[in-house]
Amino acid sequence: MIVDNFRLQLGGKEYVPIVVGGMGVNISTTELALAVERLGGIGHISDAEVGYVCDKIFSTNYTSRKRKKYAVYIDNPDKSRVLFDLEEIAEAQKRYIDYTVSQKTGNGAIFLNCMEKLTMNSATETLKVRLAAAMDAGIDGLTLAAGLNLRSLDLIQDHPRFHDVRIGIIISSVRALAIFLKRAIRLDRLPDYIIVEGPLAGGHLGFGPLDWQRFDLKTSAKDRKSVV
């Protein structure tokens, strides 16, 4: 007998418990995210190097314009004057996300993996633009990643979709989760979901090379749940 009665509940909506993460620079493609969405699950795309991704998909020239503008700094180790063009970031973000969400055909959702550390000498302004543009373009959810994201909610608290879009965080530390939740409570905007990463997840984690021998995902999840 096949039992198929488990569903993921987020914001009053039911999903098949399939969540595919968003590996950056278009490794987790629109097509992959849409395949998961068609099945009723949650597919992620990433906004890492979104200008480059748009260039590949739409033949735009965000990358070449930036390279030309800052050509003098290519061989200069001091990149303090190299900045993201915030208008272009917003434009590319909206174009890429609209392109993806407009192709939805199932009952699932398209979320964005938004790494806090993707900045260029203007951390706060860059992150705010990325998050706001994603919501403007109709993204179903924001998964905050690659950092403590202590100010991420503050940056978008005035956006009209602040309580409408699903918001979650990827976490690998009980302490980091507790700090994030303290901020979230202050803004009356608790996360809709929490993704627990262990030492085998790879990426932006706080584990050492041998920690995989001392931690398992089940125990880590229980620890994080106790904080919630």
Language-model features: locations:
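Active-site entrance/lid segments in N-terminal catalytic domains of soluble metabolic enzymes
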Residues: 1-224
